């Protein structure tokens, strides 16, 4: 007896279903992972979304919750499993998994614990999606992007850290707020480490091509009576403030990740401040990943913009590299 489906539908092609062309995987379904997932779905970037985590009940619950909203989305397939086979044929894998810093724990110890987790995650990703681009979001993101590069064996252009893409967005928002314009009309970069040693590139900040430094030569320095330097401090402190208020950050990093994913999936060639290997640039001679303005397209991170930095900015960038290397050089089992 024919089923309802067989009575309803006449099949004209017996071929297997086509493989997804823009499958996105999110590793980790915590607050950040789910913000990334929702942002990717709302921007309609994936024809399949896969979620992976070790917490089976939460994983299944998040998958079902998203599937129940399928009517309002344009991603036809949403799947989840703790087994990484569910990630097969991913175009981009976003890694948000890892452990948080415990009270009194050293940064090196935190990184080493995350290295041990990545030693399981990364080979599984590469096994099932050998041609994928990996976007690392877990913190400390620059060091874990280096760890991912080492563990994956993939070329540098396919290993990207979310880096200071969000820091730069915060920077532009705060400057725009002071000037009374929209953040998209205010241009500027935070480079270097995603963290306390990040570098505010005041020499490049502009609105409609008008350099703020040309209007106020001491902008962003200790001599600046208007205290624009506080804007960078606010950028550095903002995550801590949000965490203090709500317990975690998730929405802004989710939006930031979706913007990066969009540049890749749509082959846009947009410039993002993301974490990449910087050895040989700006006098840095160690294998560290730092954020520089990078061109992202369908092949991944294809080039770096050679920004004309001032001497003090280059010095800060080098110091940022030294900060990361001081942690990185003592990592084991890579």
Swiss-Prot record:
Subunit and partners: Homotetramer.
Lineage start: Eukaryota, Metazoa, Chordata, Craniata, Vertebrata
Full protein name: L-lactate dehydrogenase A chain
Stored NCBIfam families: L-LDH-NAD, PRK00066.1
Metabolic or biological pathway: Fermentation; pyruvate fermentation to lactate; (S)-lactate from pyruvate: step 1/1
Function: Interconverts simultaneously and stereospecifically pyruvate and lactate with concomitant interconversion of NADH and NAD(+).
Domain of life per record: Eukaryota
Main location: cytoplasm
Organism: Xenopus laevis (African clawed frog)
């Amino acid at each position: 007896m024919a089923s309802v489906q067989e009575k309803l539908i006449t099949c004209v092609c017996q071929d297997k279903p086509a493989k997804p062309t823009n499958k996105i995987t999110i590793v980790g379904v915590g607050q950040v992972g789910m913000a990334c997932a929702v942002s990717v779905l709302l921007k309609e970037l994936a024809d399949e979304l896969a979620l992976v985590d070790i917490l089976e009940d939460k994983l299944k619950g998040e998958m079902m919750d998203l599937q129940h909203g399928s009517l309002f989305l344009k991603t036809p397939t949403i799947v989840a499993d703790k087994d990484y086979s569910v990630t097969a044929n991913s175009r981009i894998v976003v890694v948000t998994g890892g452990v948080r810093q415990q009270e009194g724990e050293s940064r090196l110890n935190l990184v080493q614990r995350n290295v041990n987790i990545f030693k399981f995650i990364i080979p599984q990703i590469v096994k099932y999606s050998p041609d994928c681009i990996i976007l690392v979001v877990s913190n400390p993101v620059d060091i874990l992007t280096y760890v991912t590069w080492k563990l994956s064996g993939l070329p540098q252009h396919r290993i990207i850290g979310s880096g200071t893409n969000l820091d730069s967005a915060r920077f532009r928002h705060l400057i725009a707020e002071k000037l009374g314009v929209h953040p998209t009309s205010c241009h500027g970069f935070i480079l270097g480490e995603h963290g306390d040693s990040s570098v505010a590139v005041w020499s490049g900040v502009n609105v409609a091509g008008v350099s703020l430094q040309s209007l106020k030569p001491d902008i962003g320095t200790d001599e600046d009576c208007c205290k624009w330097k506080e804007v960078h401090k606010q950028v550095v402190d903002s995550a801590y403030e949000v965490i203090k208020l709500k317990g975690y950050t998730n929405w802004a990093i989710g939006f930031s990740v979706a913007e990066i994913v969009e540049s890749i999936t749509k082959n846009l060639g947009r410039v993002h401040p993301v974490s990449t290997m910087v050895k040989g640039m700006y006098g840095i001679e160690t294998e560290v990943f730092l954020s520089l303005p990078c061109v992202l397209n369908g092949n991944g991170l294809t080039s770096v913009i050679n920004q004309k930095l001032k001497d003090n900015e280059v010095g800060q960038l080098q110091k940022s590299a030294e900060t990361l290397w001081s942690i990185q050089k003592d990592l084991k089992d890579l």
